[in-house]
């Protein structure tokens, strides 16, 4: 990716970075195992970002 990035693109990339995390352990405990994984999880090699 190029070094120069417009601020709008940087914001979208940052949002994608932050939303690409697993479910915290306390959430799994609080929901009694109902929520185990993040269905929106994305792998950088397999899935392409449309930003």
UniProtKB/Swiss-Prot annotation:
NCBIfam families: PRK01242.1 (NF002316)
SUPFAM superfamilies: Ribosomal protein L39e
InterPro entries in the record: Ribosomal_eL39 (IPR000077), Ribosomal_eL39_CS (IPR020083), Ribosomal_eL39_dom_sf (IPR023626)
Organism name: Metallosphaera sedula (strain ATCC 51363 / DSM 5348 / JCM 9185 / NBRC 15509 / TH2)
Molecular-function annotations in GO: structural constituent of ribosome
A single BP term in Gene Ontology: translation
A Pfam family this chain is assigned to: Ribosomal_L39
Superkingdom of source: Archaea
Keywords in alphabetical order: Ribonucleoprotein, Ribosomal protein
Gene Ontology CC: one annotated term: ribonucleoprotein complex
Similarity field: Belongs to the eukaryotic ribosomal protein eL39 family.
Cited HAMAP family: Ribosomal_eL39
UniProt-recorded name of the protein: Large ribosomal subunit protein eL39
Name of the gene encoding the protein in the UniProt record: rpl39e
């Amino acid at each position: 990716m190029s070094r120069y990035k417009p601020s709008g693109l940087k914001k979208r990339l940052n949002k994608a970075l932050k939303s690409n995390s697993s479910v915290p352990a306390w959430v799994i405990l609080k929901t009694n195992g109902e929520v185990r994984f993040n269905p929106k999880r994305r792998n950088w090699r397999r899935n392409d970002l449309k930003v």
